[in-house]
Amino acid sequence: MSLLDYFKSKKKPSTAVMAKERLQIIVAHQRGQRDTPDYFPQMKQEIIAVIRKYVHISDDQVSVQLDQNDDNLSVLELNVTLPDR
């Protein structure tokens, strides 16, 4: 019987726990986007447009992030996955 008890004892996390975890992820994501300037989405699209003049890429091959430090310093990070020739 102990073998059957082993399989019965596994419980799924409650819906409240799952909802709490999802909410924490959403809140963390929104906090990260709150500090971005208003011009950032347009700047990102313009950067992608310039890259597309020279290389055929899709939007998911470009990652643009703006990190702000406590020292009033902003860092723009751009990662582009280039296709093979």
Curated annotation (Swiss-Prot):
Q: Which UniProt keywords apply?
A: Cell cycle, Cell division
Q: Does the keyword NADP apply?
A: no
- Which Gene3D superfamilies does this one have? Cell division topological specificity factor MinE
| SUPFAM superfamilies on file | Cell division protein MinE topological specificity domain
**Can you list the disulfide-bonded cysteine pairs?**
none
Task: Cite the Pfam families for this sequence.
Answer: MinE
GO process terms (BP): cell division; regulation of division septum assembly
Functional description taken from the UniProt entry: Prevents the cell division inhibition by proteins MinC and MinD at internal division sites while permitting inhibition at polar sites. This ensures cell division at the proper site by restricting the formation of a division septum at the midpoint of the long axis of the cell.
Which protein family is named in the record?
Answer: Belongs to the MinE family.
Protein's name according to its UniProt entry: Cell division topological specificity factor
